[in-house]
Amino acid sequence: MSTHLTETWEKAINIIKGELTEVSFNTWIKSINPISLENNSLKLAVPNDFTKGILESRYKDLIVNALKLLTSKKYNIDFIVTTEEKIEKNHNNEKSNIVVNDEMSTMLNPKYTFDSFVIGNSNRFAHAASLAVAESPAKAYNPLFIYGGVGLGKTHLMHAIGHYILHNNPKSQVVYVSSEKFTNELINSIKDDKNVEFRNKYRNIDILLVDDIQFIAGKERTQEEFFHTFNALYEANKQIIISSDRPPKEIPTLEDRLRSRFEWGLIADIQAPDFETRMAILKKKADVEKLNIPNEVMVYIATKIKSNIRELEGALIRIVAFSSLTNKEISVDLASEALKDIISSKQTRQVTIDIIQEVVANYYNLKIEDLKSARRTRNIAFPRQIAMYLSRKLTDMSLPKIGEEFGGRDHTTVIHAYEKISNNLKKDESLQNAINDLNKRINQK
């Protein structure tokens, strides 16, 4: 970067500063860095896509006018997200933790690395297992099956594994694919008579990462093809990593031969983050995105948003945008105003196992203690199974946690209860009515 460009930019932002509130300037303009100036085209580095969008829609003309005032020239402004810039510079031998080896490997998100993953009690085991697999592919745990709710970090860990392996061995053939994309490619290969090419793509590789495997349930041809792909890779001592929103035993209409193979290696779950982890996630996000957020505001967000990381980070960005658009300082009051729709919606649908146990016990004229007891008489065992079924359906609690809430029962007992009620619902109209009634009562709590 030339000294002239640096000096010109510093003068320009001084002009811009006089046109904006301190909040808007610090949030959107301060983080910009000039990259290059060629043929009246100015490239400016920005920290993220969100900032880029705001700058292009609200502040681009302001920047153009400030530069025109200084130089009497009208520049074309091109905002470049810094992460993309780093990837580009990798080809110029700059130090980078991400190695791109071919077209398939570019499916990996450069932001999803082990360094950017925030570790907490809710994901420590899954993180450790993922790192072990990344360090010793096909030697530690094969397959590695990661499951958990939406937005908890499963995809992040899968991409991190891919990046780590490629960093240590750039020649590794790493393929990341969603089960939906796998299915669509299979359909196209059948339609275009390219079965051989399809099989070569997925069987002649070193690492296969398949996201959201639950979506192949009920797709017989996809399951057949994936079964043979799995076998080919496993027998060739290649690493397989799979993610799902539920454990293998709970994926409906999944062939038993696939279910058993998914259970050959290690199964690791990710739970919703606790308060300390939520705070760490927010602080890391603010640091990475160069956002100036008061600590008390992050405490407020972490207290109100508990379900998943995606919503947590989304709340942070929403507050920053709200602050800029209203020209108000970021505070707890502003955060409350910005998130009022999200928080009220969350609060109205928050269901706990305690609520479920209370409603089910009342419905069947039992005590909550009966549902937690060791008694197995039908008048208690059946309502207990219904309560376990509803706990699995309506909460984000893990199977072991649900079992613990019902008198310290094993997670396999919860699975049995869930499967039994699910199967009976298909043919028992009175049970369907009971479940519908219970759902209404739970939602009214």
Swiss-Prot record:
Protein name stated in the entry: Chromosomal replication initiator protein DnaA
Subunit structure and binding partners: Oligomerizes as a right-handed, spiral filament on DNA at oriC.
Location, primary (coarse class): cytoplasm
GO CC terms: cytoplasm; plasma membrane
Gene responsible for this protein: dnaA
Subcellular localization: Cytoplasm
Record region (Domain IV, binds dsDNA): 324-445
SMART domains, per database record: AAA (SM00382), Bac_DnaA_C (SM00760)
Span list, region Domain II: 73-106
InterPro entries: AAA+_ATPase (IPR003593), Chromosome_initiator_DnaA (IPR001957), Chromosome_initiator_DnaA-like (IPR020591), Chromosome_initiator_DnaA_CS (IPR018312), DnaA_C (IPR013159), DnaA_dom (IPR013317), DnaA_N_dom (IPR024633), DnaA_N_sf (IPR038454)
One Pfam family this sequence matches: Bac_DnaA
Family statement: Belongs to the DnaA family.
Keywords in alphabetical order: ATP-binding, Cytoplasm, DNA replication, DNA-binding, Lipid-binding, Nucleotide-binding
Region Domain I, interacts with DnaA modulators: start-end pairs: 1-73
CDD domains: AAA, Bac_DnaA_C
One Gene Ontology MF term: ATP hydrolysis activity
GO BP, sorted A to Z: DNA replication initiation; regulation of DNA replication
Described purpose of this protein according to its UniProt entry: Plays an essential role in the initiation and regulation of chromosomal replication. ATP-DnaA binds to the origin of replication (oriC) to initiate formation of the DNA replication initiation complex once per cell cycle. Binds the DnaA box (a 9 base pair repeat at the origin) and separates the double-stranded (ds)DNA. Forms a right-handed helical filament on oriC DNA; dsDNA binds to the exterior of the filament while single-stranded (ss)DNA is stabiized in the filament's interior.
Residues engaged in binding ATP: G151, G153, K154, T155
Record's comment describing the protein's domains: Domain I is involved in oligomerization and binding regulators, domain II is flexibile and of varying length in different bacteria, domain III forms the AAA+ region, while domain IV binds dsDNA.
UniProt-annotated stretches for the region Domain III, AAA+ region: 107-323
